[in-house]
Amino acid sequence: MGKEKTHINIVVIGHVDSGKSTTTGHLIYKCGGIDKRTIEKFEKEAAEMGKGSFKYAWVLDKLKAERERGITIDISLWKFETSKYYVTIIDAPGHRDFIKNMITGTSQADCAVLIVAAGVGEFEAGISKNGQTREHALLAYTLGVKQLIVGVNKMDSTEPPYSQKRYEEIVKEVSTYIKKIGYNPDTVAFVPISGWNGDNMLEPSANMPWFKGWKVTRKDGNASGTTLLEALDCILPPTRPTDKPLRLPLQDVYKIGGIGTVPVGRVETGVLKPGMVVTFAPVNVTTEVKSVEMHHEALSEALPGDNVGFKVKNVSVKDVRRGNVAGDSKNDPPMEAAGFTAQVIILNHPGQISAGYAPVLDCHMAHIACKFAELKEKIDRRSGKKLEDGPKFLKSGDAAIVDMVPGKPMCVESFSDYPPLGRFAVRDMRQTVAVGVIKAVDKKAAGAGKVTKSAQKAQKAK
């Protein structure tokens, strides 16, 4: 086998009909975790339903339907391999909760793949003022997904087919627009593809002899290639934040007979080890970690990205709950936030938002109503430059710096310190109204919290 490949996460964005599903399906189909039997089954079903032309998108539709129904599907279906990486597609838009997932998502995407359709009139529709493409790309950028690849899809349906002129026109247009969002087009690979026919997906296409390949220039090393697969291979690998203090938002807390209380969650930053004394915020409970488990195996340490359960002593299920955050009691322990300052972008709100508005915030695993206490300034979405002080209200499309106050105790962090705990979605009327990143947190001075006997013992022993 040799050394295991690095895992990376990508998010696929673009307009409804850009051919995202077909393109993604093609990659999974050709390089992925779907076995031949499943594919043959899908092909047979598709043919019976007269969807013979389907193939790749069908694969994805099947997976999506299962995912939406809450069936836990074999997650390997959403994975594929390049020569360097194991790639997981963490979400494909079109899924109802796409925006929310992208923010509170279990993982941060390392790269966004933007698919635009080159067909006559299609590109224009996708990129128009109200096309979703803009929103998705802006969202990816705001949430810290700094690498981008652009697939110019459906090259087989341009006029004439595989038109170099049309491709260049689109590249020019998309470059201008991603630049407005904040991406530097020089660092972005543009690839003319057909997710349907397979042009430039895994093999260089014979239909576009004019395409001399893509190039990216960046300080971490330049790269070039011809296909979409090669572009994915040139994503810069993520650095996992093991050197930061521990932050582990709880997804659940179980009471297990004969074992005791077992909080479960994903290590976002730092390292969790047995014997560590951890503090849970905002409840301010401190205790010793007796053991750490993943997939029923004891671990000597858990690293960022690991979903683990850990056994704690002298803590009842009533003391800690979902949305609490565990950290090292001796190294920048997590604390309750009295309030915080955030940069928000209003995505879709039918009216206007003014001070006092109190929607629900989804931040990591916490789900808590927060009040927009003060609208401090309206800013330019892209540059962050101030446009006006103390605006009276905000509407869709606006970006602003606001002060927020949680309605119940919660633990959040600034995006620059702990990214997964510093981005949030604002939910109201069953949709994502706004997204935000936290600039600064006003931490509440913790009184004497509950320190369990086992924690005191462990601290003395040290």
Swiss-Prot record:
Positions of disulphide bridges: none
Q: Which residues carry this modification: N6,N6,N6-trimethyllysine?
A: 165
Q: Which PROSITE patterns match?
A: G_TR_1, G_TR_2
The segment(s) forming the tr-type G domain are 5-242
- Using the UniProt annotation, give all residue ranges assigned to the region (G4): 153-156
Q: Which family does it belong to?
A: Belongs to the TRAFAC class translation factor GTPase superfamily. Classic translation factor GTPase family. EF-Tu/EF-1A subfamily.
Query: What role does this protein play?
Result: This protein promotes the GTP-dependent binding of aminoacyl-tRNA to the A-site of ribosomes during protein biosynthesis.
- Report what the protein is called: Putative elongation factor 1-alpha-like 3
